[in-house]
Design a protein with these regions (language model features):
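Alpha-helix initiation/capping motif
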Residues: 6, 71, 109, 160-161
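Acidic, glycine-rich catalytic loops of TOPRIM or P-loop NTPase phosphate-binding modules used
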Residues: 150-154
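Acidic (Asp/Glu)-rich catalytic clusters
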Residues: 142, 162-167
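Short acidic loop-to-helix transition motifs that present clustered carboxylates
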Residues: 132-134, 155-159
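Aromatic/His-enriched, Gly/Pro-containing loop or helix-boundary segments
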Residues: 1-13
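Polyanionic/metal-chelating signatures
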Residues: 16-149
Length: 167
């Protein structure tokens, strides 16, 4: 994620002048955006912590983009299927490692392996939620897949605070 951050000197000095010395940097594209880093805001952009969170956003591509998915239902399906695939990948890898002579090796998939690692080590999954209903969706998915959820919220979650507390 650090490599995606492009700040000019003026922006860097402006941030530093108002007290910002570090930033939680995140990739911008996709539903499963990737891993975030904590970086020092200076010329070198040194990573203080790598792979802080795995970032997920309920992001549709829209009809004009020609991409998939272009509906919220499709996004939720992609998130659930990807997490199911990561579970399958972890179980299959464990079985192969335990009984290599009885099984064919599975194809290496770094993305699924990283999702499985984050899940098994209870590392945080940061959900970008643009409204309170997305926060509830994120918590429901987190409960279903035993994730450690963090919410980057919209500020309107107080409208559903009782429901959020229950989850």
């Amino acid at each position: 994620a650090k490599d995606d951050l492009k700040l000019n000197d003026k922006t860097l000095k402006s941030l530093y002048s108002i007290g910002f010395t570090a930033a939680h940097v995140m990739p911008e594209k996709g539903i499963f955006k990737g891993k975030s880093d904590l970086v020092v805001l200076n010329d070198e952009m040194i990573s203080v912590a790598k792979d802080v969170t795995e970032l997920i956003e309920f992001k549709t591509t829209g009809w004009s983009d020609g991409g998939y998915p272009n509906s919220l239902l499709g996004v939720i399906a992609v998130i659930r299927q990807t997490l199911l695939d990561a579970d399958w990948y972890q179980r299959s890898s464990d079985i192969f490692n335990k009984y290599p002579e009885d099984n064919e090796p599975i194809a290496l998939n770094h993305s699924l392996a990283e999702l499985a690692r984050f899940k098994s080590q209870r590392l945080p999954f940061l959900f970008m939620t643009k409204e309170e209903h997305a926060a509830l969706r994120a918590l429901k998915i987190s409960e279903e897949f035993s994730l450690n959820p963090w919410l980057l919220s919209s500020g309107y979650e107080y409208r559903r605070l009782d429901q959020i507390k229950k989850q």
